[in-house]
Swiss-Prot record:
Raises pKa of active site His (site feature) positions: D140
Organism per entry: Shigella dysenteriae serotype 1 (strain Sd197)
Family: In the N-terminal section; belongs to the Fmt family. UDP-L-Ara4N formyltransferase subfamily.
Enzyme Commission (EC) number: 2.1.2.13, 1.1.1.305
Keyword Ribosomal protein: no
Residues that hold NAD(+) according to the record: D347, D368, I369
Site annotation Transition state stabilizer: residues: N102
Keyword Zinc belongs to the record: no
Name of the molecule in the record: Bifunctional polymyxin resistance protein ArnA
CDD domains in the cross-refs: Arna_FMT_C, Arna_like_SDR_e, FMT_core_ArnA_N
Amino acid sequence: MKTVVFAYHDMGCLGIEALLAAGYEISAIFTHTDNPGEKAFYGSVARLAAERGIPVYAPDDVNHPLWVERIAQLSPDVIFSFYYRHLICDEILQLAPAGAFNLHGSLLTKYRGRAPLNWVLVNGETETGVTLHRMVTRADAGAIVAQLRVAIAPDDIAITLHHKLCHAARQLLEQTLPAIKHGNILEIAQRENEATCFGRRTPDDSFLEWHKPASVLHNMVRAVADPWPGAFSYVGNQKFTVWSSRVHPHASKAQPGSVISVAPLLIACGDGALEIVTGQASDGITMQGSQLAQTLGLVQGSRLNSQPACAARRRTRVLILGVNGFIGNHLTERLLREDHYEVYGLDIGSDAISRFLNHPHFHFVEGDISIHSEWIEYHVKKCDVVLPLVAIATPIEYTRNPLRVFELDFEENLRIIRYCVKYRKRIIFPSTSEVYGMCSDKYFDEDHSNLIVGPVNKPRWIYSVSKQLLDRVIWAYGEKEGLQFTLFRPFNWMGPRLDNLNAARIGSSRAITQLILNLVEGSPIKLIDGGKQKRCFTDIRDGIEALYRIIENAGNRCDGEIINIGNPENEASIEELGEMLLASFEKHPLRHHFPPFAGFRVVESSSYYGKGYQDVEHRKPSIRNAHRCLDWEPKIDMQETIDETLDFFLRTVDLTDKPS
């Protein structure tokens, strides 16, 4: 049975050995080049492949069409992935008639995502395991083929648990690979309501927060002990690593982080105390706790910190132009929920952000970006991150006011982009799913899909082309002048405060707001060209969480990236959206205040949008970049979004003159 293997780490090596022992013919192996900043304590898949005479590759992007074509030429019967670190696209997964299977280091459906070995220790679990499951587009979500449980002992650390999991994986593969080969497997669907998902960990995540219980800190030490980078803390500005520890049920009134004793080295925690058994100063060698205390100059009563004493306390300053808009006001709410952001905003109105106007870390000026150029330039210079969210983004305006769309969406934003270049500020720019135009790909991919628009005499494309050209300008500034940027492409975000019903009355709103207005007023729901066009609708909360992670930019992973933010699972036609909305409306507690439903009416796009309109039949995002850069995937079902959006708008209606 011919197979193509994607593999890395010890699990990759043992997976390859298991396949060969089971009689599989491995046509090619795909792996990664080693990261020079990572301690390589594990086996080399590349070396093993070379020793076994198997072709081995380490492409930067295995999902590139050229690699998809080369893998297709290998005609694999089955595909296996053993700890390969990138998501594999659906085009590759579909190449194998017998399917694709992944080995995951947890008991799915728990601990989907990255670093499950470390996360189970961080969270103090007493059991984990290994799972072989069928691969689907979503990470770790396919049906389970086989599992083995592994007990976690109280004295297990990351490396000992790693060895246990490797042993279990060998057993599991030895038992299961022959069954896959003969097509004799029983698959069990995962229960989505029980799933948990965890993101990538970085060395910076392992700081010891002394206000937490000693047991929690001890678990952190176990989770990242050598050969992982280790848990750490600071004495003043000097960093040190804790390699091993013990929990003491020490009753102390000392402040968390205070040194209770130096022999043994005992630190007060939020609950109990942590003994540092072995550790290492940043410029030293590993030593036992009391010697480390002497090296660091610790005495009873000394204080340890989670960050350097001189660490900057200043909040990150975020400039949001168009702060009163749909994305702007929800993003402001998310940023102000944290304690390390200062938000500066400009917009022509403030109705959606009135709830923030008295917040001490929110600063708002009412104004127009085409007039307040000096204010904008000053605040670009002053702030750390710039989000120019001002745009005309309603389809009817593309044909009704194409020049205004160009002037605002392109010309005004180009000026802001140039300010960011001038003052070397990071820009997070809202591209759009519209840039893909009439692309025929099943999934619209940021790095590979063609951007296809209609002829010049179809002005509906002026928005798409304006945004696309700005994307290209930003990319060029990044390449040639070092502009720090991220482009994000929202796919049909929905939720409360999307447009308003007054905008819908003049046709200048998005689809769901227009449909809600029809229900409120008792007018027919208009289905443009039958409403068969499909879109992938995304809850604003999912979208904002992804955007927040772009702003956070952990490990600078978002720099220079284009990221689709959408929900491929929430695909529906406009007609289906209308039917779901109607069902929600009919059972809403305020339903009796509104007129009877007036039915659906099919209208031609030219009569609704005017001359020069073209529509797009489907628009489904690939979200592999969002997985890779943000450890993000959408979670909220479309029906929940519809219910909450409808409820919000119905409660904004003045019911005094409505029938009861």
